[in-house]
Amino acid sequence: MVISVIPALSAGAAEKQSTDLIYTTFFTPKHGQTLLVEEWGKEIEKRTNGAVHFTFHPGDYLQGDQIYEGVVLGATDIGMSVFSYNIKRFPVMEAIDLPLGYPSAKVATSVINDFYNKYHPKELDNVKILYLHAHGPGMLHSKAPVYKLEDLKGMRIRSTVFTSALTKALGAIPVVKPQGFTYVLLQDGYVGATWGPLEVLKGWRLAEQIKYSIWCKRIGYTTGFYVAMNLKKWNALTKDIQGVFEEVSAEWIPKHAVAWDESDKAAREYTLSLGNKIVVLDDEKCSRWQQAAQPVIDNYEKRVEKSGLPAKEYVSTVKELIQKAAQ
């Protein structure tokens, strides 16, 4: 539980320190994550008595892979997107997205924040990280049935930069595109499958284009999300207002986790209502997928260790945090 220790700013202070901020995300206007960050903004506006005002741009300003750089350069004051849209820019945070068997968004969100707070990677020093969150267990969603590993051979799968390695390891062909392109890619037959949590089936309407969701709990991955602010804009805020930002952001971390898990449940019901199937791989089949995916983890460790970073320690830490959060 987060207990408020920062009183709302006085009306006089609000008049004196009025600040307008642009917030950009790749999510669509009606997506649950968009609605949640808009509530975040309203809460900050309320607690600062209007000293801060937000203008939101959901899915209509910057693409997901442009948002981080947009925050750094000041094209947007605040942005929410995923680390995996920017190749090799976030070698430390990349450890979060490895196929390590996340059971829920609650666990994944706890892990990513604890991991960040432990390492404070320099790769994020050019922004102010307000908070992080992560979706529920990622799985494969396909147009054709997939019951065994061999069914993936030659299949074109919409992937992020990070999940493209998993796609290759399983014998399929990655097509690296942001989430917003997935519906049309599936509709046009350019890809036969995509990665994502169950949420994408309803939140992005992908249940209209796929027939099967394949769940292997041993390689359930997540995608790490950042909410980052331009450093110059952050430093221009008064200490009191910065305190409000940090307090509200801390309160919103579990809200995102709950929203992700609830949207997974709703999407499960939705896709089944359309006649789609959820294929749960048995332990023997799932073990084969896990063995095939292991090189993704091994290659990450080798690549990042070469740059002088303790990648094996990162992976070990993530595994420990998953186990701890899942208890």
Question: For each of these PLM feature ranges, what is it?
Answer:
Residues 110-123:
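Signature of the catalytic double-stranded beta-helix
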Residues 12-106, 122-327:
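N-terminal secretory/targeting leader peptides
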Residues 1-8:
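Bacterial N-terminal signal peptides
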Residues 8-11, 115:
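Extended hydrophobic/Leu-rich segments
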